[in-house]
A protein has these predicted regions:
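Short segments within alpha-helical structural elements
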Residues: 61, 206-231, 385-442
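Small/polar, glycine/serine/threonine/aspartate-rich low-complexity segments that form flexible
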Residues: 22-23, 70-112, 242-247, 292-326
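Sec/SRP-type N-terminal targeting helices
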Residues: 43-47, 60, 107, 118-145, ...
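Outer-membrane beta-barrel architecture
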Residues: 57, 113, 277-280, 323
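Bacterial Sec-pathway N-terminal export signals of envelope proteins
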Residues: 20-72, 78, 233, 239-275, ...
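Periplasmic alpha-helical coiled-coil/stalk elements that build and connect Gram-negative outer-membrane
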Residues: 54, 147-258, 373
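Bacterial Sec-dependent N-terminal signal peptides
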Residues: 1-28, 36-39, 423, 429, ...
């Protein structure tokens, strides 16, 4: 008795917890908006933009003053030896070299140095290239958004189609259940044979399995949609959009330009990067100019403790200057590099023709596929309506005693096959619509 009560309480808690979960209502637009904020691919693309911003700031930092501090304390346990003519050493034999150890047992060097770039063509071109790289990251972010919208749209439509399929399967289940009960009554009253009941029973058994499979497929489709949204799988959602034939009226092609495709815009940015890469090699021929300065102190003593006697043992020094570096000859290295980069630029130009032809072909293919899929869907819709009429007439004839049970079973099978064909055609038309809108740059 105790165990039974505990189980009941636990079950009640689960029911209350499930009821407390919020069901998120989502239209297709709301779903895409949610995905653009939560999808992991979008989040990573945003981080790529932050990385690009960091690269720009890193390049700017190289042009700012560079300051370094150095401290060197050494114990010279073996002093280096220098060779001097004997004439410099009193009492040494003339004409010989005398080895003399120079230095102190302890030495120190402390300094602060600063440098400022005045002119470096590579720096300015690199800064411009870094900003262009950031622009490229932004466009790749846009491409990620388009890909996510495409995936979410297809997953959303898959849920709607599976939902409609399940609803129709439920109706078929109820229809066959009624037909089975009626056939059993007719058999009991002597108006039908045992084989008639068996035929309907087979169809009913099949629709039960079909209903279970459709329920599972709807769950899988919803999980896929949540995955594309970047949403936890266990969160509950309810789709608010409905599928009507009007949904295919908003994919008409307007004016199209290659710039509407983000791939074309990315290629334009890649061209600018290639041009900047060439420019960077050219400016390497220019001289570099830097200012520098250093301030410090040195010490040399025979006692390590005296190194810390700042006032008496350390001697100041300082210097400032300007440094110019002029490239003269590098074995034609820059020339060879420049030729390679020009070839790469030519490849980018060739990619324009390749991309334009690819876009033209894609638009043509997607448009034809979209138009054909819509026509196929309309035909299958008409077939489904006709097969429904045939089934209803056949059933009425059978109930009136002027038709056979086999005709009803065949009409039912044709009706369910027509339903399957329609939903397949409907889903294909929806996918073709998404693909076509993406091909003309009208998806995002």
């Amino acid at each position: 008795m105790y165990k039974k009560t505990l189980f009941t309480l636990s079950l009640s808690f689960v029911v209350l917890f499930a009821a407390a979960q919020e069901v998120r209502q989502m239209s297709l637009q709301e779903a895409t908006d949610y995905a653009l904020e939560h999808n992991q691919n979008i989040l990573n693309a945003k981080l790529d933009i932050e990385v690009a911003e960091g690269v720009v700031k890193e390049n700017i930092a190289t042009g700012l003053p560079q300051i370094n501090a150095n401290l060197d304390l050494a114990y010279n346990f073996s002093l280096p030896v220098s060779f001097l003519p004997s004439e410099f050493i009193p009492g040494a034999p003339p004409g010989e070299q005398v080895a003399v150890a120079f230095g102190t047992k302890y030495s120190g060097n402390a300094s602060v140095g600063a440098s400022q770039m005045v002119f470096d063509g590579v720096f300015f071109v690199g800064l411009e290239a870094a900003k262009t790289y950031k622009e490229l990251s932004t466009k790749k972010h846009i491409k990620s958004k388009i890909d996510v919208v495409e995936a979410v749209s297809k997953a959303y439509y898959a849920v709607l189609v599976n939902k409609l399929t399940l609803e129709l399967v439920e109706k078929n289940y109820g229809r066959l259940d009624t037909l089975l009960q009626e056939t059993k009554e007719m058999y009991q009253n002597g108006f039908a044979e045992k084989i008639d009941v068996s035929r309907v029973q087979v169809q009913f058994n099949n629709i039960k399995v079909n209903r279970e499979n459709s329920t599972k497929m709807l769950g899988v489709a919803e999980s896929l949609l949540k995955f594309q949204l970047g949403m936890p799988i266990n969160e509950e959602i309810a789709l608010t959009d409905e599928l009507t034939l009007d949904i295919f009226d908003d994919a008409k092609e307007g004016s199209f330009g290659y710039e509407q495709r983000v791939e074309y815009s990315i290629l334009q940015t890649q061209e600018r990067l290639a041009l900047l890469d060439i420019k960077r090699t050219k400016v390497e021929y220019l001289p570099k100019l830097d200012l520098y300065a250093s301030l410090g102190a040195i010490a040399g003593t025979g006692s390590g403790a005296n190194l810390f006697n700042i006032g008496n043992e350390w001697f100041d020094f300082g210097l400032a200057g300007v440094k110019m570096s002029v490239p003269v000859f590098d074995g034609l290295r820059k020339h060879r590099v420049l030729q390679q980069k020009k070839v790469k630029l030519q490849q980018v130009h060739n990619n324009y023709d390749l991309l334009e032809n690819s876009i033209n072909l894609e638009i043509e293919q997607k448009q034809v596929a979209y138009e054909n899929s819509v026509k196929t869907m309309n035909v299958q819709l008409e077939n489904m309506k006709l097969s429904q009429e045939v089934y209803e007439i056949t059933k009425e004839k059978y109930q009136a005693g002027v038709g056979s049970n086999l005709e009803v079973i065949n009409a039912d099978a044709d009706y369910k096959q027509a339903q399957t064909n329609f939903f397949i055609a409907l889903y294909n038309a929806l996918i073709a619509k998404v693909d076509y809108k993406k091909s003309i740059g009208n998806l995002l």
